């Protein structure tokens, strides 16, 4: 199985886990509790702009949960807002007040519903440490995944705001 955590749009060959039910969601649930999935049953997990929506002290357990459900040599494709880039964008003197507000919403979440909040800012060093602590190996930084049309390839104001990593079990 290929599991898209936080997805909304159906794609052939993929199952969707989302905290909010909609017509394309196969599993309603939370990245923090993957108990509905058996150990080593998933080939690939894709999670774009999901990890920042949980509290930092719960992130390691969430990553360990993903590790548990992945098959041997399974892959985690993970994308998070890159705090280093977002901070650089926010202090850019060429951005106007409206653009800076947009960047700030990328840092703190859009806050359009009860789930659209960011609890933690990730950069490569932090995420790499958490992935290693969850026992992932071969952590590779990539420009994009070319799997879904989502925020992982978003470049507002010329800033590539996503940190995209592939981690192997």
Per-segment meaning from a language model:
Residues 2-86, 165-169:
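Conserved SAM-binding loop
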Residues 58-61, 65, 71, 75-168:
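S-adenosyl-L-methionine-dependent methyltransferase catalytic module, highlighting the catalytic core
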Residues 1-8, 20-23, 95-98, 139-145:
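Short linear motifs at secondary-structure transitions and domain/linker junctions
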